[in-house]
Amino acid sequence: MKQLTLAKTVKGVGIGLHKGEPIEITLEPLEANSGIVFFRSDLNASYKASPENVINTQMATVLGDDRGFISTIEHLMSAINAYGIDNVRIVLNANEAPVMDGSSISFCMMLDEAGVKELDAPKKIMVIKKPIEVRDGNKFVRLTPTKEPRINYTIKFDNAVIGEQSYNFEFSKKNYIENIARARTFGFLKDVQALRSMNLALGGSLENTIVVDENRILNPEGLRFKDEFVRHKILDAIGDLTLLGYRVFGDYTSYAGSHHLNHLLTKEVLKDKDAYEIVSLEKTTQKAYEKVFA
């Protein structure tokens, strides 16, 4: 298998979740071994998508340095991962990626419009060789070796609408588009005022967020899936793991995980060189490796 980039440049416009301002986004092809690069056109500043460049994980995954930052990258990163794109430049004219409808389906549509192009370099994946786990009390995220990568995610909220939900996701592009990509971000009505007092969630609305009260969902159309909440957490986790620079070939398990725990997990993986192996798919014929890109 070869590395992939986009066949052509595509453009889009959306609202920023936290600042509520219109944002222009452009996805551009990049040459082999470039990785995923964010570029803020208003600052003339580039940020490689990697754990080392993450500066905040409070409400979203944020890349940055002393020049500035780019927030809420995880939904776009998730779609890029699902499509097997290895090299792409993401141009933004603001400090966050647009939220679109709160899921990653709009980014999937942009990638469909762009198409893919094979590059003259072998695709590489990160194969997990031993268990790596990060805990915070009873919350944890874990990567373990596997023959067929899956995500097993459980969430538990003290809320009658959400409660406890679990979902097991088996990696493939088709499975992602059908079962994960349309799952929207969510928030609680009781938190809205506090967030907005901190200049956060200013662009949040029923058009891009599932808003949950104590015992009801405020969105008139309801849920897209009965377990949309945990599916969105899987969407986020895929995006966060993409910061490792490769499709991760390992089982990811989470109980009440978060952007912060995912970030700590990626750092722990990179810290232990015995925990993973970078495998070139040009040198292997194992169908299990190729299956995840189907």
From Swiss-Prot:
E.C. number(s) listed in UniProt: 3.5.1.108
InterPro entries linked: Ribosomal_Su5_D2-typ_SF (IPR020568), UDP-acyl_GlcNac_deAcase (IPR004463), UDP-acyl_GlcNac_deAcase_C (IPR011334), UDP-acyl_N-AcGlcN_deAcase_N (IPR015870)
Pathway(s): Glycolipid biosynthesis; lipid IV(A) biosynthesis; lipid IV(A) from (3R)-3-hydroxytetradecanoyl-[acyl-carrier-protein] and UDP-N-acetyl-alpha-D-glucosamine: step 2/6
Keyword Zinc among record annotations: yes
Any one GO biological process: lipid A biosynthetic process
Enzyme class: hydrolase
Keywords, comma-separated and alphabetical: Hydrolase, Lipid A biosynthesis, Lipid biosynthesis, Lipid metabolism, Metal-binding, Zinc
Record: active site: 259 (proton donor)
The keyword Ribonucleoprotein appears for this protein: no
One Pfam short name: LpxC
Superkingdom as given in the UniProt entry: Bacteria
Summary of the function given for this chain in its UniProt record: Catalyzes the hydrolysis of UDP-3-O-myristoyl-N-acetylglucosamine to form UDP-3-O-myristoylglucosamine and acetate, the committed step in lipid A biosynthesis.
NCBIfam families assigned to the protein according to its UniProt record, in alphabetical order: lpxC
Annotated family: Belongs to the LpxC family.
Protein name: UDP-3-O-acyl-N-acetylglucosamine deacetylase
Source organism of this protein record: Campylobacter jejuni subsp. jejuni serotype O:2 (strain ATCC 700819 / NCTC 11168)
Lineage, uppermost ranks: Bacteria, Pseudomonadati, Campylobacterota, Epsilonproteobacteria, Campylobacterales
UniProt gene name: lpxC
